[in-house]
Amino acid sequence: DALPISAAFATIVKAAFSPKAITGGAVGSFLVAMQKGVARGIFSNEAGLGSAPIAAAAAQTKEPVRQGLVSMTGTFIDTIVICTLTGLSIVLTGAWQVDGLEGVQVTTYAFQNGLPLPKELSAFVLMLCLVFFAFTTILGWDYYSERCLEYLSGGRMKYVKVYRWIYILAVFIGPYMTVSAVWTIADIFNGLMALPNMIALFALSGVVVKETRHFFERHRNGEIED
């Protein structure tokens, strides 16, 4: 139904730009909200971290610009599509107004009350999604970090093998840590990754612009097949 969805979007916008939010921003809460929002956004879509290009670089393609354009869609789908749908489900079901709910509990409540399924089945669907998301995230970041270590060590696989055991140990330790500690560690390491990568992005921006313009010019001239 378009009407409730429009109302949900209106609620989100009003909450962000209400006089209360603006007044709070004047005393610093706006900066805190921005900090948390940017940190969680980066955690969600990895924009600016330089991690996704590690996987994209493994693709076999004659056109690196095309591969870059394909990789860019990941950020759009993850943030604009998936996160928006999740946010709408939370607002439409009123989960965000329920006291005592935190983290995944809010999403669980939204799924249980939003999906046309029994509550137990809805919770199971969400749990199944979380299992797959967590598992693929573990595999993905292991691949990223192994490629980085392999590059830094000059291809010495003995270091990579030791790192794999450390990584596996960290996976088992993680669930026993507090949520705030996990977020703090994630934010610190994301910042450590983003800083050198942003410097590289600015340094190579001229090359990126040149290659992108050249790609689209050749595409307009019919030199590149769709």
Question: Can you say where each PLM-predicted feature lies in the sequence?
Answer:
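Extracellular/periplasmic helix-loop-helix junctions in multi-pass membrane proteins
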Residues: P175-L192
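Short, small-residue-biased leader/transition segments that mark boundaries at the very start
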Residues: D1-L3
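Select transmembrane alpha-helical segments in multipass membrane proteins
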Residues: A21-S44, V81-C83, L88-S89, P116-F132, ...
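Alpha-helical transmembrane segments
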Residues: A57, I138-K158, V207-N221
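Helix-loop junctions at the membrane interface of multi-pass solute transporters
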Residues: G41-A47, S51-P64, S71-T75
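Terminal cytosolic tails of multi-pass membrane transporters
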Residues: G191, L195-D226
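Membrane-interface interhelical connector segments
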Residues: L92-E120
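Membrane-interface alpha-helices at helix entry/exit sites of multi-pass transporters
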Residues: T61-I77, G155-R164
